[in-house]
Amino acid sequence: MKIDILTLFPEMFAGPFSSSILKRAQERGLVEIGLINIRDFSTNKHHTVDDAPYGGGAGMVMGPEALFGAVEHVARKYGSKPGRVVLMCPQGIPFTQAYAADLAREETIVLVCGHYEGIDERVREALVTDEISIGDYVLTGGELPAMVVVDAVARLVPGVLGEALSVMEESFSNGLLEYPHFTRPREFRGLKVPEVLLSGHHEEIRKWRRRQSLLRTLERRPEMLKQAGLTREDREILKELLASLNELDLS
């Protein structure tokens, strides 16, 4: 997979992309990440990319010239238009695990990091295929959201993570929050690992994990249950959990 990031501050990405899973994914040729400085495509001698907004108002707006030039540069590099051109934007669609999985199916994507008050609307109309928000808050620029998107998408590329099962069982991948994890020692400062996890009984462990996953989702993100692919067994467990929680509320 090839990911190109259009940014005014390429140096911001050095740390996150040169360590851990993303570093190994690049070394193995599973993911290629290109950092493109938008200023390199400015058409004026001062390499500025922003200007005052027509109609007045506060702040500056990123103009179309450099952004068009940068996207066209990526198209020339690959010999075709990028699969998706994604703008990091607080007005965008909320970024979810399902959205990450959708982007991971593309061969090439371009992430555009906005700055200032925003970008010229003609860039949106002519180039941008997606607009993504990572939350209902405003950041200084699109660089941090782009890092989040790259991390979430790259780990879904086949081969990047060692075990496909691990990816499938993570929070949100199956519509539920993930179950609790434990490792050695069996007891730490009086806190013990649940006995079922030490039993070696795979079916009982599966049931316990599923129950815990349902409980966490019910307690922390109940709205997710409406979209989760619940089985008949899941629904029975939820009835039991709701009854238990109601008893606690009444006691």
Swiss-Prot record:
One of its GO terms (cellular component) is cytosol. Keywords: Cytoplasm, Methyltransferase, S-adenosyl-L-methionine, Transferase, tRNA processing. GO terms for biological process: tRNA N1-guanine methylation. This is tRNA (guanine-N(1)-)-methyltransferase. It holds the Pfam family tRNA_m1G_MT. Belongs to the RNA methyltransferase TrmD family. The lineage of its organism: Bacteria, Bacillati, Bacillota, Clostridia, Eubacteriales. S-adenosyl-L-methionine binds at residues 114, 134-139. Specifically methylates guanosine-37 in various tRNAs. Its EC number is 2.1.1.228. Homodimer. GO terms for molecular function: tRNA (guanine(37)-N1)-methyltransferase activity. Signal peptide: none annotated. It comes from the Bacteria. It is found in: Cytoplasm. It catalyses: guanosine(37) in tRNA + S-adenosyl-L-methionine = N(1)-methylguanosine(37) in tRNA + S-adenosyl-L-homocysteine + H(+).
